[in-house]
Every structure is written in structure tokens, then in C-alpha cells.
Amino acid sequence: MTLARRRLLALALPLAFIATPGAQAGVGDLLVAPTRIVLNGSRGTEIVLSNIGDDVATYRISVELRRMTGNGSLDDVVEANEREKTAQSMILYAPRRVTIAPNQPQTIRIAARAPAGLPDGEYRAHLLFRAVPPPRPVAPPSQARGVSFELIPIYGVTIPVVVRLGNLQAKVGIANVALASSNGKPAVALDLTRAGDRSVFGDVRVFKAGIKEPIAIQRGVAIYTEIETRHMVIPLNPALATSAAGPVTVDFVESTDNGPVSLAETKTVLR
């Protein structure tokens, strides 16, 4: 059997978003800033895409749904509940497909329009920027023998879009702090708990008395409203790992427009 055209098999490779709202998420030759959108009310904002590659690149933009699990991973939603459907439908953005020249930026406008009578609360979806592969030349019939496949990676960047309606509150707790290992290296394990009607997003830090910098830190930690507890294992700073045992202070500092705000702190002894 001869095919004159190669059949292309696309492999999607999603990327988890980077920690801080002011940072840039990147995959391939695409940078996205900011990496997290919070919309309060009807006022919108902008996202800047930057093509840092040497070739023209095209990206398709779509609204996707993800659910967080207890270990912090984000799973695709197969069957959306009513809240997720509402979140997906209220997010407005333009354009939905962009072609960006090398070393040039592109602005995406984004806003949310809540349906009349929608209850106060937090609604979240995720914006996916997926690369569109350039067209491939068709092999001449004389060169196409049998069935051939070509794997073309399709890269994507996903960022959360959080819509908040009303005066929402959240409380965070830190529990079960203990020494652990991550990929065979020393680490700190702990559980973050969340209560309230909104998500939280910030940094987890572990301090030892007399040492200025954290002996362990995890930036950009989110706890979304679908979970109440998130388990974490944070690698220790290799230069400070030998002094980890003993009394420590662990805190969770949320990133806000007005600077970092401490939401939780606990003192314990690492054993």
C-alpha cells in the first residue's frame, strides 16, 4: 500500500505554569506573561506572548478545564460539572489564533462576563496556547513507499484564569512536616490545608534559626478550590541539607498585588 502523503501523528506536550504572576512561562520558542490571571469584576487585562525563536510561529488559543489533585497535578476534565461549564463560558478573549514574527510580541485581551444572577464565588478555567505546526512538503509519489509516520511535537503553554465574584476569603494551615526524600535526595514533606471559598497561590518556605536563606523553598504553589489538602515534598537546598534536622519554621506566603502576605506559619522539629 502506497500513500503519497505522509500521515502526521501529533503529540501534545502540556507545560505546568511557572510560579510567580510576574514571571514568564515558556515552552519551545514561546514566552507568556503573566502566568496567572485573576479577574475581579468585569474589568479585563492583557496577556503578552513573545516569540523568542528565529522563525515565524503560529499559536491557537483555547479555554480548557483542569482539576487539581491532592499532589498538585492538574488533570484534564472529561466531564465538566456546572461550575466548570460556567467558568469556561464566561471567559472572553481575542484574538484566538496568532502568528508572531521572530523576536516580536503579541497582546491577547481577556475579560470575564458573569451571567446575571451568578452566585458569588471563584470560577476557574485555563487558557491554552498551542503551537500550530507549519505545513510540511508532500513527498513525491516516487519517494513514498508504504505507510510512513512522522512524529511532530505540538507544544503548549497553559495558564490559569481565575474569576472572583464577591468578598471571598481563604485560610491556610501547615501540617505533618517531616524529613523525607525526593529522587533520592533530602527533602521536606508537608501538607497544606485550605479552607474558605477561594484558592490561594504563593511560596512555601522552610527556615532554620541562624540561617538567613530558606533551607527549602517551593515557589508558585497553588491550592485550588476543588481540594482542601495538598501534599508536597520539597527538596532541601543541597548546601544546607546537613543542618536540616532540628527546629524549623515553615510558612506559606501568598503573592498579591500589594506584595507578599503570610497566610500560615508553624514551628516544628524536623526528624
Where do the PLM segments sit?
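Intrinsically disordered, low-complexity segments enriched in serine, threonine, and glycine
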Residues: 180-271
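Beta-sheet-dominated interaction scaffolds and their linkers
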Residues: 25-56, 97, 171-185, 193
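Short, solvent-exposed loop/turn segments enriched in Ser/Thr/Gly
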Residues: 40-46, 106-107, 119-126, 184-188
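Short acidic, flexible loop segments centered on an aromatic residue
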Residues: 54-55, 59-85, 130, 193, ...
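Bacterial N-terminal signal peptides
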Residues: 10-19
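Bacterial N-terminal signal peptides that target proteins for export
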Residues: 1-11
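Intrinsically disordered, low-complexity Pro/Gly/Ser/Thr-rich segments with frequent PxxP/GP/PP motifs
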Residues: 79-116, 212-242
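Terminal connector regions
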Residues: 64, 113-162, 242-270
